[in-house]
Amino acid sequence: MRALTVQRVKFAMDLPLLKRAGQDLAEKTKNFVSRSLVIGEVLSMADMATGVKCGIIYWLFGGAIRNLGSPEHVTKWFQPLQEQKYTGMFAMTERGHGSNARGIQTEATFDLSAQEFVIDTPCENAEKMYIGNAMYGNYAAVFAQLIIDGRSQGPHCFIVPVRDENGSLYPGVTAIDMMYKEGLHGVDNGILIFDKVRIPRENLLDKFGSVAPDGQYHSPIRNKSARFNAMLAALTPSRLAVAFQAMGAMKLGLTIAIRYSHSRRQFGPKTKEEVKIIEHQTQTLRLMPHLATALALTFVSRYAGALLDEDVFQGKELVNSRSLQALVAGLKAYSTWENIRCLQDCRECTGGMGYMMENRISGLKCDTDVFATFEGDDVVMLQVVGRELLAQYTKQYEEKPLFGLLQNWAESVGDKLRTSFLAFNMDTVDDLAFLLKAVKFRERVLQRGLVARIYYKVKTKKEDFFHAWNSCLHHVASLSLAHTHRVTLEQFSLAVKSCPDQEDQTLLMKFCLLYGTKLVFQERAWYLEHKYLTPMASTRIRNQERC
């Protein structure tokens, strides 16, 4: 399986379309991010292992070179990568540190006399784990603590040779095959251990931090934490690529399940032909909301891709686009979780046929389950969103205290009016305006609630921020998902309005309403608790979802 995947990667990257996409990546031409994301989605639909392995080599390893290196690094390393003269891997995660990448323990100690970095794995917890392409790759983009004169400058990325052109490991490098996994059997994941491996000083990807020949460290960002944030922000496109791959799996699973549901017949009126199983209400209720969600995620992900394109094309540093980073983090979590739920329903809705590997749904389930934790654990991704929303809320008070207070008062009064008995007949539950107002209301209330909780714990109870934040994580997750839901529904509605074909627009509007109804229906207890819905309105929403 692995050898076949290697052949497929080589074949795919030789295709003119993908060669052109690689050139666009190198040159950062307009809309290159969006094009690459869609290509990755389609490639993953054809074979998930091939799509993921291409992503490891070109998005992660290649992305590290493009986004963390200098123009000289791009010329030296990325162009030969495009020409398939070698392959690479991305080595950040360690046995002891995954989500908290700042705590990685691999060391890169600068040797002044030799003008080299010494890459070393000082302990078992510092072993690089789950590294894709570990058993085939020639070079690794290794994140390690940069140490000069015994002092760490924080994590930096280094290009480390792993194998020669014949596939033999270089001295000091150990690669251990992690063997069998739940899925992605075509991807070779392994453990990397470095025993004082020496690399040239120039192999440091130095966009955000460099070491001069005299051993002096220079960086445009003085704060270590801010510097590492900038490095992680530069890798944002690869996180969005996972969302696109998850959507590809959703779309493929739904296509198979819905087509099967239109061909399979079970039960029916006496003396008449059995009906298609899609005509059974439970089958429709399980599949159609997932289809609506897949459409919604398609439009909002394209929106995020367009924003990324614009920033990259204009040469902006992604670290300064915090709201975009938060959006991508939220979409990564939301899309991968929805994919898992969707494929499980697709499997069940196709019965025994869905369990057969030849029909692909069970394979997609196994292959994409890991999406919930790689490229950022989904729960941690929600914290990225929550921190940005908290920062946005506090910023408006710091910059314009009076305006912030007035805005908060106006929103609070407006929310109270919306939850009064006078408000319930203003909008009908089957109207898109009602659904948009509902998801905005939920996000706004949860945001105010989180701010109040954090303020009380830090200012009144004198707790440190970490413990205050940690005790509010459930609220953070709820707010972050509410924010992602709101943006997704808004982008879906905008896409529907801009659809040029009337017939397509009418059909898309039905799915947009279904998606919005799903969002409100699944949180109906919260809306009832906050008196945004009456029991009668909740019943109408339930009936609407069943139509």
From Swiss-Prot:
Residues binding FAD, per UniProt: 350-355
- EC code: 1.3.3.-
**What InterPro entries does this protein map onto?**
ACOX_C_alpha1 (IPR055060), Acyl-CoA_Oxase/DH_mid-dom (IPR006091), Acyl-CoA_Oxase/DH_mid-dom_sf (IPR046373), Acyl-CoA_oxidase (IPR012258), Acyl-CoA_oxidase_C (IPR002655), AcylCo_DH-like_C (IPR036250), AcylCoA_DH/oxidase_NM_dom_sf (IPR009100)
Would you kindly state one Gene Ontology biological process term found in this protein's UniProt entry?
A: fatty acid beta-oxidation using acyl-CoA oxidase
- Name by which UniProt lists this protein: Acyl-coenzyme A oxidase-like protein
- Gene3D superfamilies according to UniProt: Butyryl-CoA Dehydrogenase, subunit A, domain 2, Butyryl-CoA Dehydrogenase, subunit A, domain 3
Q: Which gene encodes it?
A: ACOXL
Q: Which GO terms describe its cellular component?
A: peroxisomal matrix; peroxisome
Coiled-coil positions: none
Q: Which GO terms describe its molecular function?
A: acyl-CoA oxidase activity; FAD binding; fatty acid binding; flavin adenine dinucleotide binding
The family line of this record is: Belongs to the acyl-CoA oxidase family.
Instruction: State one Pfam family annotation.
Output: ACOX_C_alpha1
